[in-house]
């Protein structure tokens, strides 16, 4: 199977296929010429697909922090280290948008404001919202535009400046620990338990294409899950199946789930 056939086989959509072709060709060229190169920010699924297609290639991923979900993929020659990525000539920059603490803004508020400002999602990395500020990573190409034009989120005025990546403030992740019993480890049952919705409603979300299992689209409610699986549902959020225990006297399976708030 050649590269194009492999990508076509792995990609879930035409858009995903075109993205993989662009990314892999760019990184391939950089490796062959031994020159630095970086992509836009990729989702976890996109990162997994790039790893699969370019298996064995000397590429790396970088999102600014070790916990980052959205990361760029890059190739660095031996004469460059990771510090170059966030330097003056590097492909990634960090931004802080400050606002009055009395104003309450969410991740959704900032993402919507950034999209409304005219930048594309792939130019934005992870977004970290805390009291009075929001820190996020961007590709260097959009930095000057954002510093001049990203002035508000809704009706809230913003003071925007570039900061160094080590100064990015990451708020503590709020989670809810859930202990429950389920009849089986089917995806629809775990979604029902993790998000406290009916199994029928969970099945609707899944069949509508709103669910990802380990960052891959999944439309089968009867798909079996396992420990450490990560499930995201558009409109509901993200959960992780942390532990699968024994059975109750009635034959139900004990599970422990983390819901990310």
Residue locations for each model-derived region?
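Basic (Lys/Arg-enriched) interaction patch that binds polyanionic ligands
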Residues: 184-235
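Ferredoxin-like alpha/beta domains used as RNA- or RNAP-binding modules
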Residues: 1-194, 217, 237-261
């Amino acid at each position: 199977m050649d590269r194009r056939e492999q990508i076509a086989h792995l990609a879930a959509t035409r858009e995903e296929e075109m993205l993989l072709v662009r990314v892999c060709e760019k990184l391939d060229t950089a490796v062959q010429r031994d020159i630095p190169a970086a992509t836009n920010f990729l989702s976890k699924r996109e990162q997994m697909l790039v790893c699969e297609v370019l298996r064995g290639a000397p590429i790396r991923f970088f999102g600014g922090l070790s916990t980052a979900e959205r990361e760029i993929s890059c190739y660095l020659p031996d004469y460059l280290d990771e510090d170059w990525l966030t330097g003056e000539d590097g492909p990634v920059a960090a931004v802080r948008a400050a606002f009055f603490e009395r104003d309450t803004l969410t991740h959704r508020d900032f993402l919507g404001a950034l999209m409304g400002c005219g930048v594309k999602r792939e130019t934005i990395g992870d977004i970290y919202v805390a009291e009075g500020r929001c820190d996020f990573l961007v590709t260097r190409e959009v930095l000057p535009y954002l510093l001049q034009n990203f002035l508000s989120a809704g009706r809230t005025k913003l003071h925007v400046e570039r900061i160094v990546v080590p100064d990015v403030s990451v708020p503590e992740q709020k989670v809810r620990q859930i202990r429950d019993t389920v009849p089986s480890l089917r995806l629809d049952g775990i979604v029902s338990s993790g998000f406290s919705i009916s199994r029928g409603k969970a099945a609707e979300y899944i069949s509508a294409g709103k669910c990802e299992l380990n960052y891959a689209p999944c439309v089968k409610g009867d798909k079996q899950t396992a420990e450490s699986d990560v499930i995201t549902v558009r409109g509901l959020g993200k959960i992780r199946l942390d532990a699968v225990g024994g059975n109750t006297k009635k034959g139900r399976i004990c599970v422990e789930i983390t819901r990310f708030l």
